[in-house]
Each structure stands twice: as structure tokens, then as C-alpha cells.
Curated annotation (Swiss-Prot):
Catalyses which reaction(s): GTP + H2O = GDP + phosphate + H(+)
Designated name of the protein: Elongation factor 4
Function: Required for accurate and efficient protein synthesis under certain stress conditions. May act as a fidelity factor of the translation reaction, by catalyzing a one-codon backward translocation of tRNAs on improperly translocated ribosomes. Back-translocation proceeds from a post-translocation (POST) complex to a pre-translocation (PRE) complex, thus giving elongation factor G a second chance to translocate the tRNAs correctly. Binds to ribosomes in a GTP-dependent manner.
A biological process term (GO) from this entry: positive regulation of translation
Organism of origin: Porphyromonas gingivalis (strain ATCC 33277 / DSM 20709 / CIP 103683 / JCM 12257 / NCTC 11834 / 2561)
SUPFAM superfamilies: EF-G C-terminal domain-like (SSF54980), P-loop containing nucleoside triphosphate hydrolases (SSF52540), Translation proteins (SSF50447)
Keyword GTP-binding: yes
Primary location class: membrane
EC number: 3.6.5.n1
Amino acid sequence: MKNIRNFCIIAHIDHGKSTLADRLLEYTNTVSGKDLQDQVLDNMDLERERGITIKSHAIQMDYEMDGEKYVLNLIDTPGHVDFSYEVSRSIAACEGALLIVDAAQGIQAQTISNLYMAIENDLTIIPIVNKVDLPSAMPEEVEDQIIELLGCDRSEIIRASGKTGQGVDQILRAIVEQVPAPAGDPDAPLQCLIFDSVFNPFRGIIAYFKVVNGSIRKGDHVKFIATEKEYDADEVGVLRLDMEPRSEVKTGDVGYIISGIKTSREVKVGDTITHVAKPAKEAIAGFEEVKPMVFAGVYPIEAEDFENLRTSLEKLQLNDASLTFQPESSVALGFGFRCGFLGLLHMEIVQERLDREFNMNVITTVPNVSYKVYDKKGGCKEVHNPSGLPEPTLIDHIEEPFIRASVITNTAYIGPIMTLCLGKRGVLVKQEYISGDRVEIFYDLPLGEIVIDFYDKLKSISKGYASFDYHLHDFRESKLVKLDILLNGEPVDALSTLTHVDNSVTFGQRMCEKLKELIPRQQFEIAIQAAIGAKIIARETIKPVRKDVTAKCYGGDISRKRKLLEKQKEGKKRMKQIGTVEVPQKAFLAVLKLD
């Protein structure tokens, strides 16, 4: 046990941690040359393409130093803000962390938030400046930032490059010398911390865990504390490039368990595994149920695909326990599901995976957040969907979730960023200068304003330099109204949104204009209206396409032409009464991209 080292890598998106991890695997001969592809640990195609890590991964390496053999367990963590709970559980399974900072970009918001998490868990931090081979690298300046943040010595910072392999041996030495061995009791009752689970179509759910106390053997009868379910350990083992079965996984080691579990709801990240015969007195601290933050309706384009969509979502849920869904129906779109996501990136990834892995074409409605609605009698209910809102006369007030956001940016872009945050109803909390030309700005913002396009706009006004991180802060009372969109007097429930009173008129006008561009012209006139309650606040009209019925009349009496025109008008009127308006998928998504 004294020769085991468990460590994770903390880095902002695109700071090169997956590439550096590849070098570590190569250097310790965990991966042979023929198996080596870029980003070995990112095993979903989507992860490689987007260059982000979505799931936590783990891999074991052997390393020999000064004649001693060591076992190093690298637990790779997602770097994106949506997956911060997964990161926190992965960090809890480690004793040390490599803090990787891009030599060209410096410290970013995500790096800082994950670093604080690591420091809270008492991890040993090994600072690394990566990508020093880039022509635009500024290693000295970035080292100054790290020293200011960590208060470490300049000599402790390792300069490395994932591309050329520079500094890899120093990193491995530092891991062995500085990261403490796991402190567990081999004779205590079994406690394993689950930090991830994956779904295998043949073996069911495979849980990845770190043994904190005791040890687990093949064939043991075990119990998962949070779900109180019991299983037999059909197979336990360690995670090399593939899974390697072992008869026993000892204290401090990282391994996997296969026990024929069918659904991901039974394996919760952060749960504790213990023996049924000799159970641990308590679970490992820090487990929490992950709560979705952003909700959206997901509907199949073809109505008969409803059951397929259900099975696809269930399969995705096997691999992604933070996705929640329940059936709902909409007048405009038929039957579908109300899905809960951790954040916008998570929502996009789920959509892409539905498309790629299951070939499902879906329509997604406008995302919204969950609101607390208080009625006049003092009761409170959570509303995830604008159509679930009670009558306005019954509502006393509505509270919406606020987040505390931290934006790190170059001082040149402070003005435009503050304008953006004010436009989103933000309240400035404080600002701190990190170094001469970098500043961290803290804002309280309503989550509902952020879910749509905040991140894209932030990136574009700061030329890609600003980075953004947030956590839920509290619920606050807001003046919110439900905005309905009517087509020819019929409300389209999938386009309803909750919006703030001050922005409602401009938002309604922009929605109508956008829909006018996107809905194709019909044989009859279409009125697009935005309404709050019974009051219409904006309107656009799509003119009908019409045939020139008087073309075949040459000269002659005007009454003949008038008769034909009247006849056409009658026909159009009848059409309008029975005609339905098709709303294309683009229109539902356009709401997200209103500028």
C-alpha cells in the first residue's frame, strides 16, 4: 500500500491534460506504440472531437524509481463546469493533483474552482506549466500567476510539454516523492468510494471505485449504502488500458466491480460500497444526489419513435446518471420527455449522443430552469415548465435561482463584459486583480438568463479570452411573467417561456420577428402574436402566397374580376379556419439564438 499513488489532473478545457496523460502512459509503458492514439483516455468519439473530457476515466501505471516499484493510479476528471460534481468525487478519491496551466493562456476560471476543491480535500498540489514549446508561451508570467495563487516556490513548478514529452520524467518523480500514499486501514470494515460508472451491454453497469478501508475480493457479498441494494461481486479488478480481473483489490487501490447491475440509478457517484456481513458504520462523507439545473422538452420528430426515444434515454442514463427525464405531452409536438440536465453543455452532449449513438432525430424546446412558485395560501411548488405555471391570479410571487459567477478576463474587455452582465440583470459583487492585466469579476446572475446564450456572447466579446465558472447561490424573488406565442390565435405551448417583466416586450417582439423569418409562407395569412395573459404585446403577419386569378381576363367588365377575387378570398378564409401551421425545428432552436 505504501507504494500506491492516486492522483488526478486539474486543468481548464484545452490546457492539454489529455495529451499530457498520453505522455505519462507512454513513458511508463502502459500503452504500447501501436495502441497509442491521441487522447487515449477520452474514449467517446464525441470527447475526442470536441477536445473535452466528459466522463471521469481511470488508468493504472507501473513506474520504477530507484529500484522501487510503484503503482500510479491516474483518475482523469472532466474539466467543464457542468460536471463539477463528478470532478469533486474524483478529487475525493485522490491524494494528489497535478495542476496544469497552459503557458500561453495562463490561469482560467475553471482551473481556480477545481483547485479550491482539491485544496478542500487536502490534496498535494504539483504545479505544471504545460505547452512550453509553443511560440506564444510565456512560462515566466504564468509561473508568477501560479506562485501568487498557491504561494509555492518557483523551483517547485515543473515546465512540461505534452507534445514533445519534455518534463514527463520530472512529473512522475514528483508524484512519487510528493504525493502521500493512501491512508487507509486494511483491517477495518470495507469502504469503497464510487467515483464513476460505465455501462457495458454484456456485463451491465461497471462501477469504478477507490478502496478507502478494508479490501474487496471476488465473490464477496456487498451492499451499496445510499441505495441499500445488495449484490455479489462477480468480478473485481484494476483498470489498466482495459479491465484486468484480480482476485482481490486492496486498501488504497483503484478498481472496478461487475455485479450484473441493470440500471444506473442503482450506482450513484459518491456512494459507498461495504460488506453485508461486516458493514462499515457509516458512508464516506460528501455524497449528494445530483440535481439537474436546466430543463428542456425533448420530442421525437416522428410520433411513432416515442418508445425508441424512451429506450435511448434510458440507455444514456445508464452511462450518465445525472440525466433525468419524465414523460410529458405538448399540443404542438405530441408526446415527449421533460429532461433535466446539469447545464447547457450537458444538454448539447445528450442531444448529440442521441443523434449519434441511437440515430434519434429530436426536437428540443427552449431550455428553462426550475422556479419556486408561491401561492396566496403560502404553499410552494417547483415548476420546471412554463405550462405548469398556475393562473396568474393565484400566484403570490415567484422565486428564481441565482448563481454566483466568476469571470476571469483581460482588463481590456471589462467594459463590454459588465455591459453584458447588466443586460442579463446581473449584480456586481466584487472584482479582484489577479495580475497586472488579468481581473476576476464576481457577479450574481439569474440562471434563467444564462442558459440561453451567455457563454457564446461572453466568448465573442472577449475574443475568446474570458473564462467563466459558476455555482448556484440562492433563490430570489423576481417579477416574472409567462410569455405565450400564438399562431392564428392558437398558443404553441412549446414556445412558451417565463421572462422578466422589463424584458418581456422586447423579447416578444424579437421572437415574433424571428418566427416570421423561419415559418414558411402558406396558402393563407398567418398571424404571429406574443401575449402575456390576454394582452397582445407584439405581432407580425406572414402574407399568403396567392395565385393571380384575374390573369385570364383580358379587358372586359370589372365585375368579372371582382367576382373571381371575392371567390378567392372566400377560399382563403375557409383555408385559414381549417389550416394548420407547421412550425419547423429551426424555429424552436431560434429562440436560443435571439441576439
